[in-house]
């Protein structure tokens, strides 16, 4: 049986200058990262990390610190499949030799964590990889990048952490049984990102319920709840029907905003049909939630960028090709704020209305349980045939 530590134990270890091991969800990377506080970096800690990890040492920083230190993205289009935000690599400009030694890397890591460091103190490129953590931490993105800044901040230190993936002697990634043995051998605390999410949920609130009212629709009467996110400032809406707190799984649709499909009835996508069908199914069941997530227009690229992508699609590109040609991610959505709204409404386990497996994984990463994926019907016609085919063949949607 795997023995995980508590987040409080991990915080105490980090504050004492010791590393911890953090593992993410089995549906995500399913990897364990060695993490310690950047401001407490020593040559010994870096050497230990190099010995037992891939050696690709990263330093997770807040968005503000990345901007203050003039750390631009490694590439203008982030095509990393997990959305890890790699910045241009750095070394210390002074006080180092080649930059690759444990002592040299410990020095630049401490510089990155020091609020008095200026852009001129850093040389580019270098041997340490800064990562840009999402504002809101693991409540916005359940990655090791955000776990590193969250744990150091919660420990009372600067929100800057050092991280690298633990590997076996043969170079394969350590999974939970390997991580458990490693932690036992080296007396390290092992925690999960899911537990960090739950800890922050217990101690912090990231969404605010602003207003509630009755909303009569052609599908029946819903209770409409309006929320504002603390970090994204977007205004999200949940249509609620029935009692959500009776212990049964809740039928849920987490719907991404789509002005063209939801409001104007565009035939280029199936968004409007999915929204209407979700409301109908929840009303038929008499219990459930239709969550309308703002800021997801065009899979997160925004309305005007979506219209630019439409221009390219009119010239023969598919929806994936168009985004990439514009230098935009294929899918920039995160479900952290939406998951917090569902949690605040009382949802703990759900039957999720979606054809997109990534949406299921996105919500489960925030401590919600999806017991069943409920497929939504698909209507193919000449205007959306290629779009649906691309979603199925290139984005992994389950369209039957």
Swiss-Prot record:
Site entry: Essential for DHBP synthase activity: 127, 165
E.C. designation(s): 4.1.99.12, 3.5.4.25
Active site per database record: 331, 333
GO MF annotation list: 3,4-dihydroxy-2-butanone-4-phosphate synthase activity; GTP binding; GTP cyclohydrolase II activity; magnesium ion binding; manganese ion binding; zinc ion binding
Cofactor note text: Binds 2 divalent metal cations per subunit. Magnesium or manganese. Binds 1 zinc ion per subunit.
Keyword entries, A-Z: GTP-binding, Hydrolase, Lyase, Magnesium, Manganese, Metal-binding, Multifunctional enzyme, Nucleotide-binding, Riboflavin biosynthesis, Zinc
Gene Ontology terms describing biological process: riboflavin biosynthetic process
Binding site for GTP: 253-257, 274, 297-299, 319, 354, 359
Region (GTP cyclohydrolase II): 203-400
Chain residues that bind Mg(2+) 1: 29
Region of interest (DHBP synthase), ranges: 1-202
Family membership: In the N-terminal section; belongs to the DHBP synthase family.
Protein known as: Riboflavin biosynthesis protein RibBA
